[in-house]
Amino acid sequence: MRSTKTIHVISCHAEGEVGDVIVGGVAPPPGETLWEQRSFIARDQTLRNFVLNEPRGGVFRHVNLLVPPRHPEADAAFIIMEPEDTPPMSGSNSICVSTVLLDGGIVPMIEPITEMVLEAPGGLVRVKAECRNGKAERIFVQNVTSFADKLSVPLDVEGIGTLTVDTAYGGDSFVVVDAEALGFAIVEDEAKDIARLGVRITNAANEQLGFSHPENPDWNHISFCAFCGPLSQTPTGLTGRSAVAIQPGKVDRSPTGTAVSARMALMAARGQMTIGDTFEAVSIIGSSFTGRIVSQQMAGDRPGIVPEISGRGWITGIHQHMLDPSDPWPGGYKLSDTWGA
């Protein structure tokens, strides 16, 4: 076999959402901080194109790059590459990275509980894993500070009319809409319609509402649209279905950890949740993340929360992505039949 590039990947999913992990073959990108390294990858596009575009990738895939941590408290660091963005943080990808580190033997597993600190571009992520018989069975991720941004504001969406929406940050930035008011029960056969409408709503929110993180002015857009179903009370806390539309037009198969964090921040702002309360988010395929408010914390001048989300991850395979020097598409390709709403 001829190859000018070989990248070693352990494939994983967290509650249905793919989050592959690059464990070898890629040198750390330039940058003094993890955020600068993230920004280089986002600008350069070479690695993103190679692993996310067809024929090696696809719109369904997220890929995480393991890099040496820059923060002295961190045991490992990772940079998240999503189909159209290189975000500060991701809950499902944090679970995938933790699963690969522990189940793959990269970080020593201690049963029954392994604790470690990961560094994401958006900040430190404290992880606790419940482990048994060599398997990390459930991953608990203490997320970055999350906060409500705008509450109950109007948004005009062409072809729909005026919606009442919220915006919030949970490690990534969201416009949040009432799924039931738009006729969605958040079931599998609605995925295409949710994806298409979600992209339109996200684009409208960026044009009309905008977003700027109070401590990181580089993060100045709304990434996703979260369709949130009605809440119900259970003996252990609140529960509700949700679906997140991801650019350029797909639905997250998991409940989206950053969306769970953002939704809990909105509920805290409205007095529906407080410290210690839990929320079970159910995805479009029926998988779930459990969220909990750990504490209150400011994000710049914004009152916020420190959320914890938990879920499960599974390794699905080991791959070596290669580049034959005669391949006319070294950066791959993407077509509108799958890449775009």
Swiss-Prot record:
TM spans, by residue?
none
**A GO molecular function for this record?**
trans-L-3-hydroxyproline dehydratase activity
Pfam families attached to this UniProt entry: Pro_racemase
Record field: catalytic activity: trans-3-hydroxy-L-proline = 1-pyrroline-2-carboxylate + H2O
Give the enzyme's main class according to its UniProt record, as a single word: lyase
| UniProt KW Lyase keyword | yes
* Top-level division of the source organism's lineage: Bacteria
- Which positions are catalytic residues? S90
EC number, UniProt record? 4.2.1.77
Q: Which UniProt keywords apply?
A: Lyase
**According to the record, what induces this protein's expression?**
Is up-regulated when the bacterium is grown on t4LHyp or t3LHyp as sole carbon source.
Residues reported in the UniProt entry to bind substrate:
G91, S92, D252, G257, T258
Provide the family line. Answer: Belongs to the proline racemase family.
As for what it does, the entry says: Catalyzes the dehydration of trans-3-hydroxy-L-proline (t3LHyp) to Delta(1)-pyrroline-2-carboxylate (Pyr2C). May be involved in a degradation pathway of t3LHyp, which would allow L.aggregata to grow on t3LHyp as a sole carbon source. Displays neither proline racemase activity nor 4-hydroxyproline 2-epimerase activity.
Protein name per its UniProtKB record: Trans-3-hydroxy-L-proline dehydratase
Species, as recorded:
Roseibium aggregatum (strain ATCC 25650 / DSM 13394 / JCM 20685 / NBRC 16684 / NCIMB 2208 / IAM 12614 / B1)
